[in-house]
Amino acid sequence: MGRKKGLPEFEESAPDGFDPENPYKDPVAMVEMREHIVREKWIHIEKAKILREKVKWCYRVEGVNHYQKCRHLVQQYLDATRGVGWGKDHRPISLHGPKPVAVEEAE
């Protein structure tokens, strides 16, 4: 009995029952969506960390030529760090925006 070959199967998509217009409609789907967002953020953060280590290694190995030889890694690292963070400014407005106020009409 050995290990199965291949990669494990993970659920990588957003939850099916989540409604961004009314996120509190289904609390289970809302929690699953929040966990999905956090998981995706961690993946992006870890990718940026790996690229940062590659850039450090390239700078050490290439020495004075690192401007030309490591440019592609630096560009990948800068692209990976854009938009990565935990602030509200990177989340969809429907998840953190002001709640609409119901206006009652006078008859």
UniProtKB/Swiss-Prot annotation:
One of its GO terms (cellular component) is mitochondrial membrane. Pfam families: NDUFB10. Residues 1-23 are annotated as: Disordered. One of its GO terms (biological process) is photorespiration. It is found in: Mitochondrion inner membrane. Belongs to the complex I NDUFB10 subunit family. Complex I is composed of at least 49 different subunits. This is NADH dehydrogenase [ubiquinone] 1 beta subcomplex subunit 10-A. The lineage of its organism: Eukaryota, Viridiplantae, Streptophyta, Embryophyta, Tracheophyta.
